[in-house]
Regions:
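Catalytic core of non-heme Fe(II) oxygenases with the double-stranded beta-helix
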Residues: 86-230
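Non-heme Fe(II)/2-oxoglutarate
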Residues: 1-80, 102
Length: 230
């Protein structure tokens, strides 16, 4: 599927490559996202992330080289170049969303990003759907406006910060428009999300049980001096 907002590719990896990559991420260093990581709000539930890597540092001499080769080949392909022409680097990190976790509405700070669904099994009623609003359908600014005298102390000091508590006004336009489409977290599916696309991820339902929504995600960087470190 190709739209102005997303490019979706199913059966992205061969079975052996998929198996080896899933095996590799289980040997990474993992941490739980903290409240200071304002991409997730306090009420969004616990989620987990592995260590981050960048394509520029490949080869890694482990099974992440499988992903580095695959995402580079994809980015250089004709379908993807419409979205990522001129990229200079690609970030890669595994995220885990267990039952009760979600990701709120955002625009990835206006950047081009991707998500690859690494988990082996998923049911449609387990939710954790990617929700997408049509481009330019709403006016939405991800960064919080700082009032006079406010000094930023968090890890987003170089880029601006995001609201922790006052989100209702920002989200008013989303509910007023109230229409879009979803992309299910189908195993072995890659989704490229275009720049300035408003999107969110619904909560993992309790029906998922012990199953965790696993993704390899990252930004495409376009400037030699720019490294989007999220």
């Amino acid at each position: 599927m190709k739209t102005p907002e997303v490019l979706v590719v199913d059966d992205f990896l061969e079975q052996e490559a998929w198996d080896r990559l899933l095996n590799q991420v289980q040997c990474d260093e993992w941490t739980q996202s903290q409240p200071d990581d304002k991409y997730w709000h306090i009420t969004d539930g616990a989620n987990y992330k592995a260590s981050k890597r960048f394509l520029r540092d490949a080869p890694f001499n482990d099974n992440y080289d499988i992903w580095a080769d695959a995402i580079r080949a994809f980015a250089d392909s004709e379908p993807a170049q419409e979205y990522v022409a001129g990229y200079t680097d690609i970030a890669m990190r595994c995220h885990g969303y267990p039952v009760g976790s979600k990701n709120p509405w955002h625009t990835d700070m206006g950047g081009v990003t991707y998500s690859y669904y690494l988990h082996k099994h998923w049911q449609i009623n387990w939710d954790s759907m990617l929700l997408v609003l049509p481009k330019d359908s709403v006016e939405y600014k991800q960064m919080m406006r700082k009032l006079p005298g406010t000094k930023q102390q968090d890890t987003y000091a170089g880029t601006g910060t995001l609201e922790m508590f006052e989100q209702a006004e920002k989200q008013k336009g989303l509910i007023e428009h109230g229409m879009g489409y979803f992309v299910a977290p189908k195993p072995n599916r890659l989704v490229l999300i275009n720049k300035n696309v408003v999107h969110g991820i619904t909560r993992v339902d309790k029906d998922a049980g012990e199953n965790v929504r696993l993704t390899i995600t990252g930004f495409f960087n376009f400037f030699k001096a720019q490294v989007v470190n999220v």
